[in-house]
Amino acid sequence: LNLFAGPNSSGKSTVLQALLTASDNVTEKKGKHGLKNRRTEASNFNDVRNFVTNAKSYEIGISYNGEEPTVLCFTPGDDSYQTTLVEQSADASSDLLGILGSDNLLYLPATRPGGAYVQPINPDSENKLGRNGEFVIDYYAKHRLEPLDAALILAPGTQTLEGQVNHQLDKLTGYRLVVETVGNNHYVKYETRSGKQLFPYHVGTGVSFITEVIIACFATPRGGMVITENPEIHLHPKAQADLIDFMAKVAKAGVQIIIESHSDHLFNGIRRLISQEKLALSDVSVYNFRQDGNGLTRAERVEFTPQGGIRSYIPGMFEQFDIDLDAILKL
């Protein structure tokens, strides 16, 4: 379970975009090719190069289970910097190719739509959830009756995607997801515990957004990776705390989860789970991002004690609650 925290524009999403770019561009054999950007909006070299250092190239290095990193070097493909060439330093291992494959790496951006009654059918078989998470409901509708990996069966009595999603959704919100497919569209409603079906815009936006996160977690196979930006969107603090409990269980089942968030409830939820011995220190990594005096990103790993305490204080990290409370109490 991984959490990226820190101020706006400090580099958190850049790391996620680097992972997605690597997923798009790493190949079995070393060599050179043009940039592929199926998962990101970065279409030319100028979009992503470091302007602070006036970079004429940049690299993404990625390794799996302690292997030597596979390095992708990106250079401009023309004098205008409008195109990009990618050169891969070495052959990629089957393990690395596996975890970066389109079936094993799923992504929910902060720009995911959420809340719509009518949802489209996905024409792209290689991008299960869509570039912006617009096809999460489509994935659910197509796979809802399929059994999940045994490790991802978190609730007894059901083994299907539909059963597990609705168990968690009911537990977190009191609703169940109902999807009807007619023609080229899916129609979404939420069912109360009394059996009444409601349109998404009648149940609160947070229900739709948490539904997408739950589906994405269950859609990721054991050994795969799910990246989600701001899973706490539109959620009450109690729901945020319950959500991190769920995501920790999915991570414990063997799914690599990467969260980008500004929520102190998720951060403190991780600390609580550590203190309750429900999350091992070896199974969690939290990084705080900041910009240094030169405008460059620095990422500091947050170290925890077995009691959920923070070993070394990092200025500015989730301290606003304490600042406000001190002001209220005039301390």
Predicted features by range, described:
Residues N2-S43, G204-A216, F246, K252, ...:
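Phosphate-binding glycine-rich loops of NTP-binding sites
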Residues D242-L331:
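C-terminal lobe/lid and adjacent interdomain/linker elements of RecA-like ASCE P-loop ATPase modules
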Residues E229-N230:
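Walker B catalytic acidic pair
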